[in-house]
A protein has these predicted regions:
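Formylglycine-dependent sulfatase
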Residues: 2-3, 7-8, 15-465, 473-500
Length: 501
């Protein structure tokens, strides 16, 4: 791993972060708290610490980067929502299970098997308090009214409801069955019904109303939502403030007697882009930019809560995104903003813009300030890293695709490089990354939202895509035909990984 020193030019808020002496060992006998904040569709180029030309103010994330470590080669296991969330919590690629492409929906059944180990369940066995607050998007077990124990009159639902659910029964198994002591959030993305807040296994308010779909896909730059069931008091604009309030409240309740793990998957800046009034006009990238700025403020509130509770010094705080930004090509010249930096593509794509994500780590007790790592990491690595922090190894059968990056964080020993990393697009297109090389077999397109999505190889031409990311990080030159040995090696390794499912 190559470490690059950078002089901080970002103003650090009134002593918010503590500088750490380079190379000094600060092993604490007390298990650290772990807070994992995962934004939804946040791009690498949105953050000022990655992109000096960003049109969006991100002072809190920039301060975290300056007070800790910034990774430049971090990846989500998928280029879309649900499979990345599966990978984060299980340390396992989602395509090894039943989700081979696409995402879950608001009424999808639980994607993670209750018996499977998760980061939360493993940390719970180590004495941690655990919570998930925010966007779930991994499904619940939803009781069907056809198998109800109560009279239908007890549940008010729209007529001819296509997914009749008895909300008087527990929505279980769900997050609580996967190791989380506490859950508060929404079932899926902010544009997917049912629009309802769930606390542990019950909705706060029954989704007895209906909302119409938004009028335009990119209404004044504000994105869209689908029509469907909703709680009568549900407002899309309230979601980010509400989940932030719950996350801060949960942190405030931690008394220091036990370490805690907070998984905080934000619902933003995924569409619809609905910044509250105080953030409108703060950025120069439309409502999207304003929503990102609001997300940055949310992260600042979490840091403040950690600091006020005396937790910040011994908390491993990670800020990242579930995939690349959904920043379409036309938005780049319109706003002169590159949400995915110079990387090709966007959310959902197999190209780098789909899965190369921001990744910031702050832990004053162990991580030196103002450091940058170019080690390749994947969000599936959270499980192995969290256990490594505690001096524990992965249990048999757990975290199949998880590798610890603790050595990269602490710089106490030379980190072991990831042998290979598998990428996966929304339509199920695979890619394999090994060192500088990235291979995409069988498709000459994006496999996602960018055109062309699918381009089948032609006779006499390349059978896929091969890029050297060191010399060509923007994936502009396909060198498949010039490197047959590398193609063969990577295809063999990918096939071996897939057979390991």
């Amino acid at each position: 791993m190559k470490l690059i020193w950078k002089i901080a030019t970002i103003w650090i808020f009134g002593g918010l972060f503590c500088n750490v002496t380079w190379g000094e060992s600060k092993q604490s006998a007390k298990s650290p708290n772990i807070v994992f904040i995962m934004a939804d569709d946040l791009g690498l180029g949105d953050l000022g610490c990655y992109n000096s030309d960003s049109k969006i103010p991100t002072p809190h994330m920039d301060a975290i980067a300056s007070g800790g470590m910034r990774f430049t080669d971090a990846h989500s296991p998928s280029a879309v929502c649900s499979p990345t969330r599966y990978g984060v919590l299980t340390g396992r690629y989602a395509w090894r299970g039943r989700l081979k492409s696409g995402v879950g929906w608001g009424y999808s059944r639980l994607l993670i098997e209750p018996a499977r180990a998760t980061v939360a369940s493993l940390l719970k066995t180590q004495g941690y308090n655990t919570a998930c607050v925010g966007k779930w998007h991994l499904g619940f077990q939803l009781p069907d009214l056809a198998a109800k124990d109560y009279p239908a009159a007890n549940v008010v639902l729209p007529k001819a409801h296509p997914h009749a659910v008895d909300y008087f029964k527990p929505l279980a198994p769900g997050p609580n069955a996967l190791g989380f002591d506490y859950f508060y959030g929404i079932p899926a993305s902010l544009d997917m019904n049912p629009y309802v807040f769930v606390e542990n296994e019950k909705p706060i308010t029954l989704p007895t109303a209906m909302v119409e779909k938004s009028a335009h896909r990119r209404q004044n730059g504000g994105g869209m939502w689908r029509g469907g069931d909703a709680a009568p008091d549900f407002k899309h604009i309230d979601v980010l403030p509400f989940v932030t309030e719950k996350a801060v409240s949960w942190i405030d309740k931690q008394d220091g007697k036990k370490p805690f793990f907070l998984y905080f998957p934000l619902s933003a800046p995924h569409t619809p882009w609905v910044p509250t009034a105080e953030f409108k006009g703060k950025a120069k990238a439309g409502y999207y930019g304003d929503f990102v700025n609001q997300c940055d403020n949310v992260i600042g509130e979490i840091v403040s809560a950690l600091k006020s509770g005396g937790h910040l010094e011994n908390t491993l705080l990670i800020v990242t995104s579930d995939n690349g930004s959904h920043w379409i090509p036309g938005d780049i010249p319109k706003y002169k903003h590159r949400a995915n930096l110079h990387y090709r593509g966007q959310k959902a794509d197999i190209w780098e813009g789909g899965h190369r994500v921001p990744f910031l780590a702050h832990w004053p007790a162990q991580v030196a300030a103002r450091t940058v790592s170019d080690q390749t990491i994947c969000l599936t690595d959270l499980m192995a890293t969290a256990l490594d922090v505690l001096g524990e190894s992965l249990p048999t059968g757990a975290g199949q695709d998880s590798y610890s990056f603790l050595a990269a964080l602490t710089q106490t020993k030379r980190p072991s490089e990831r042998m290979v990393t598998i990428h996966h697009s929304v339509n199920g297109t695979f890619a394999i990354r090994k060192g500088d090389w990235k291979l995409i077999p069988g498709n000459l397109g994006s496999g996602g939202f960018s055109a062309p999505r699918v381009v089948k190889p032609k006779e006499g031409g390349p059978s896929g895509q091969l890029y050297n990311l060191r010399s060509d990080p923007s994936e502009t030159k396909n060198v498949w035909q010039e490197n047959p040995k590398i193609v063969e090696e990577l295809q063999t390794e990918l096939q071996s990984m897939r057979r390991g499912s």
